[in-house]
């Protein structure tokens, strides 16, 4: 899932940065967690080590480890579920739904040229009460008999591939335990989880998204790949834009071709293929050093950069990317930079030789960052209340030709959908972006114990996990208090 080849490209070109994400004392860093994606990664990692554990036991083992790390690193997770909190909502928005709807409408490329390129309104763009969040079942409501969110009798190990055992992830069980423990969560309803994560990021609700899906980068988010390491590998969207020397609208319009969910049967392009078609070359080390020096010595000027030339009408095609990127590489255009540099970016964001906690350049266990420095960096990070808002996302449509094929129609619709998720709306003098509702149930440890003992029948295993939850997952703070302290103080 995600952008094909982006993860490999990011590692090869050193765009995966090691950051501490340390918050000042008394603060928690809010982070959106794509629950299925994160738990899938952990279960695949640990289920081989514990072959005797059933689905619920291995899921709870991974969840205990996850919650322990969140507590140790002062991270405040907001869990985003797939297919609603009951795991039964049909997904009618997002990349997969756009592809399915478009291919059902159009049988040939000729038909695609006559179809409206607008996707259906999402729960975020529709001003009416949304049905996507209407089927919330509050914590403690009993499930139908036999409903466990499992694959049923078909979950046996496939005989043809013994090296790849069936995934033992009890997603619904995981959600119910988290709700009983009082953690904040998003009921994505009919949205895909990564779309809900992008909404949390661009509404300045969370500072990062914890996922390995690189399509979040296409939606302009900064992602965390793994929080269990001593350092935390992250990929910042702005780092990629600087490296590619392009604006976000260009990035969205160009790399939508790499989105695997939009292009079935291996019809997607890889990141390397797209860059090769554009004759893009990576910056030399001397260019990188000069860029870092300029960032350290330049004042935070707000003067506007000369805009990129508008796309030609009617005849615009992807071939024009070659000329545009060639001129950018040659210095003809400056890369867009509307907001101040993020102090958590690659250079640390602070002028002068002083080290920063943003990117760890020495072994993590040797890094001792004073709390005063953490507080200064935090205040600098949240100084601009609109730092995550992307105002120019609609310009991506200017870089696309009119859709003439099914593939181009799918890409066009998806970009419009992304704009509806992350692009603010003008309402007179106000700029508005609707945030998905956040829920947080009252912590009920008795209910958590009941859920665990009902699904994990071995008393010793259940008691061990319950003790871990009691000691390693203390009651989380109220999400409104955490967000107000992080963003407003």
Curated annotation (Swiss-Prot):
| Family annotation (SUPFAM superfamilies) | PIN domain-like (SSF88723)
Q: Which UniProt keywords apply?
A: Decay of host mRNAs by virus, Endonuclease, Eukaryotic host gene expression shutoff by virus, Host gene expression shutoff by virus, Host mRNA suppression by virus, Host-virus interaction, Hydrolase, Inhibition of host innate immune response by virus, Interferon antiviral system evasion, Late protein, Nuclease, RNA-binding, Viral immunoevasion, Virion
A single Gene Ontology CC annotation of this entry is: virion component
UniProt-listed Enzyme Commission number(s): 3.1.27.-
InterPro entries noted in UniProt: PIN-like_dom_sf, XPG-I_dom
Keyword presence, RNA-binding: yes
Task: Identify the stretch(es) annotated as Disordered.
Answer: 110-135, 142-161, 285-319, 332-364
Q: What class of enzyme is it?
A: hydrolase
Annotated consequence of substituting residue 18 to H: In strain: HSZP
Major localization class: virion
Extract one GO BP annotation from the record: symbiont-mediated degradation of host mRNA
Localisation: Virion
Outcome of mutating residue 115 to A, per the record? In strain: HSZP
Record-linked Gene3D superfamilies? 5'-nuclease
Q: Which domain of life is it from?
A: Viruses
GO MF terms, alphabetically ordered: endonuclease activity; RNA binding
Keyword RNA-binding listed? The answer is yes
Bias class Polar residues marks the residues at: 124-134
Q: What is the effect of changing residue 452 to M?
A: In strain: HSZP
Q: Which family does it belong to?
A: Belongs to the herpesviridae VHS protein family.
Q: What other facts are recorded? A: Strain 17 is relatively weak regarding early shutoff compared to strain KOS. Strain HSZP protein is non-functional for host protein shutoff.
The entry describes its oligomerization and partners as: Interacts with human EIF4H, EIF4A1 and EIF4A2; interaction with eIF4AI and EIF4A2 presumably allows Vhs protein to associate with the eIF4F cap-binding complex.
Q: What does this protein do?
A: Minor structural protein that acts as an endoribonuclease during lytic infection. Degrades host mRNAs in the cytoplasm by cutting them at preferred sites, including some in regions of translation initiation. Together with inhibition of host splicing by ICP27, contributes to an overall decrease in host protein synthesis. Also, after the onset of viral transcription, accelerates the turnover of viral mRNA, thereby facilitating the sequential expression of different classes of viral genes.
Protein name per UniProt: Virion host shutoff protein
